[in-house]
């Protein structure tokens, strides 16, 4: 049993990593509340899966345009201080959501606008957060640290949506947003307690455009990194089905807001099981092959979800859990490869480029699934998206066979093709 449990040595060995990890878990639980509340609020206002799907567009545009610059900034300043600024801005965005909802002025355009603003601040926040974490632990502990980060993220994706369903059903939307505000305050407190040694603060002095170009050139020169990011982008673009979950809760399963919360929480439950038994993942040798197999399972589970009848709510929860569990395995492998193969001075920029791929795919995928649902049907959107995800795996294996062959030497950082 201990061989499959997550390795918590990074939490024991580094006080700063422990503080970052705990604060991030609390704030992400609050953010998960918001990510249920906003789509549900828009669905209540419009009854349209397309309107919900357009949230992805308003989230993706600032994320893609600003995250690259967030990576450049993260490699030029103290990353902890940068996180203090972005955390504060994200908290203020949630305050605006709560106040506008309480005052009854949270129209669809207002919700789109605040989604875009929050996404922009997240685009600046996440590269710094991703780049800071591996610098707080020894190189040999990076795989375990990445698995722990996935664990806390996935647990938050269970806690947040499940709590959101209960809160929205019992108290309304505004309390969910206020709890999100409170979690950002806790995360800010954890950052204030951190003491990152000056020797761990990497400062890049190149001109911003040159620094950005250097990051892109490094990624382009590493087909392995580019391929693993691309697989995730296209897989999630086709298979992410968050935009149609309000439809499934309302029209297919007829389970109300509590059921919607469970539909959003089920993926996190599956991912949590994987993350909490991730010891075997840290010791896996064929990480590239693991990515391909995991993404294929993810796509198949989503396609099967789309075929369920109205009586299939419990089966649907199980399939969503399996899908996200598989995606979590892929994500741990991918993030580990990225951090092992990237010099610390480039981690901010590479984390930003990674964010464009791994967050841009799901956000744009919401638009894609909403459009297909509107033109065809929500069920067809889910089934075809899952099958397209499986197709992405086969294409990637043919075009970049070195992904399936990848191994890594944790002691020296040497990749084995």
Question: What are the roles of these predicted feature ranges?
Answer:
Residues 1-417:
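Alpha-helical transmembrane-bundle signature of multi-pass membrane transport and export proteins
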